[in-house]
Amino acid sequence: MSQYSGKIVFFEGKCFTGRRLEVFGDCDNFQDRGFMNRVNSIRVESGAWVCFDHPDFKGQQYMLEKGEYPDFQRWNGHNDHMGSCKPIKMHGEQYRMELFEGQNFTGQCVELCDDCPFLQSTGFSKNCLNSIKVYGDGAWAMYEEPNYRGRMYIVERGNYCAFTEWQSENPNIQSIRRVVNYF
């Protein structure tokens, strides 16, 4: 399977009303496209997306899969601020990652190939995850709380030497799931 950008449409008003912005790939700043940072509803027509509440792919992350989100509470937003977005890339259907307790791939290591609602159930002794290697084809969503709750971070294929590389402010990760709804 090749990479696919997809399509996402942002609306200023709730229930898909008001001005709209259609995006087909990376968009680092909504204002550069003449769209204010106020988003009250979203329609994902294809693909899976990671959206950020600030420009330049910064701030709180929200994963949006194919479907309709008539108000910001539906994507677990705390307000209507949205500043940038990009499609989550998929290269195939193989998922594999290694999790490390220490920075720079040191300390206890656990391998995942499937969803994990509670990281400590794998034998990982702490909820401190300081570095990861994503080997597989797909992306992963990592959450600060068990059962896929709390602040979320998206990671794609690559090496992340420290938690700051996935834009976290701390190493607390307690659940991880595969991003599977790409189309």
UniProtKB/Swiss-Prot annotation:
Keyword match NADP: no
The family this protein is said to belong to: Belongs to the beta/gamma-crystallin family.
Beta/gamma crystallin 'Greek key' domain ranges (all copies): 6-46, 47-89, 95-136, 138-180
Keyword Methyltransferase included in the entry's annotation: no
Gene3D superfamilies associated with the record: Crystallins
Record InterPro entries: Beta/Gamma-Crystallin, Beta/gamma_crystallin, G_crystallin-like
Domain notes per entry: Has a two-domain beta-structure, folded into four very similar Greek key motifs.
Entry function: Crystallins are the dominant structural components of the vertebrate eye lens.
GO terms (BP aspect): lens development in camera-type eye; visual perception
The entry's keywords: Eye lens protein, Repeat
Subunit structure as annotated in this protein's UniProt entry: Monomer.
Top-level taxon of the source organism: Eukaryota
GO terms assigned for molecular function: structural constituent of eye lens
A Pfam family of this chain: Crystall
Designated name of the protein: Gamma-crystallin N-A
Chain's gene name: crygna
